[in-house]
Amino acid sequence: MTPEHLPTEQYEAQLAEKVARLQSMMAPFSGLVPEVFRSPVSHYRMRAEFRLWHDGDDLYHIMFDQQTKSRIRVDTFPAASQLINTLMKAMIAGVRDNHALRHKLFQIDYLTTLSNQAVVSLLYHKKLDEEWREAATALRDALRAQGLNVHLIGRATKTKIELDQDYIDERLPVAGKEIIYRQVENSFTQPNAAMNIQMLEWALEVTKDSKGDLLELYCGNGNFSLALTRNFNRVLATEIAKPSVAAAQYNIAANHIDNVQIIRMAAEEFTQAMNGVREFNRLQGIDLKRYQCETIFVDPPRSGLDSETEKMVQAYPRILYISCNPETLCKNLETLSQTHTVSRLALFDQFPYTHHMECGVLLTAR
């Protein structure tokens, strides 16, 4: 695979290899055959970052080969959304001959939605002044005149200039309902929107007969929390990143949801609060004992669950675990399988044509 070519004819073979690999990794814990969720074979990534290369009068996007570190020119990027590909051409055309926009520009980040909105961030090794703002405003207006719903942001050391806003609102159809998700520039969002819909619908399906409340750790912008509210009486969710918490609060209001409570704290801190080890001012007014959480949802970073959180989640009858790293999932399962069994297993092909696997397991108490 190269940035400008996807081996789409190999899609089924690479997916079958992942299924076999996941099944082999999970064999010590489960004999289940993974439920498999396919990605679109192209134009599946909703965000992308590129370095910019200045070559005389020419200017173009580049990526670096992960093995050789050699520079690769990228004029089209079929892994990314059609809108990103359109914007890549438009941005180069708009910046190449404009000194204020081009000078010291070293990176462009693109964030798009299925609803065809975009935020484009231009990163500089220079101070951004009024001349830059005027040039960027003219470029934004020219892009909008082409029918592109785009917002531009300029970034430099200790500087961020938003011409309008630093977010876009995604609208995802999830199991018959549209959910609005505010996505903030430079914050984590699910990169493969089509796969995200399938992940949300799978999580809904495996928790459809749930009782009581849901506790979610690492909730981000509320991606899973908002979808899962319909299966639970209440949802209590934790997140540490301020922009994600703000986006989650907006999403709760935008979707008219009244049974989700977001707490800004790390999973490790929440574990201490639940165990009565420490008291936190952020929990004033929230009676944790009121919640009857019989299901816990975790979507941890690549490092997986720490040992204290492992112990904490074992107290719940059902654990729904979305993993972006099956190796750390299996490490966690060495502990979790002492008290729980794997009752559902899914593979989500979030990043086709790569080694990367995303998977989901539902664990039920023995």
Swiss-Prot record:
The keyword Zinc does not apply. One of its GO terms (biological process) is tRNA methylation. S-adenosyl-L-methionine binds at Q190, Y218, N223, E239, D299. It comes from Salmonella paratyphi C (strain RKS4594). Its EC number is 2.1.1.-, 2.1.1.35. Keywords: Methyltransferase, S-adenosyl-L-methionine, Transferase, tRNA processing. GO terms for molecular function: rRNA binding; tRNA (uracil(54)-C5)-methyltransferase activity, S-adenosyl methionine-dependent; tRNA binding. Signal peptide: none annotated. Belongs to the class I-like SAM-binding methyltransferase superfamily. RNA M5U methyltransferase family. TrmA subfamily. This is tRNA/tmRNA (uracil-C(5))-methyltransferase. The active site is at C324, E358. The keyword S-adenosyl-L-methionine applies.
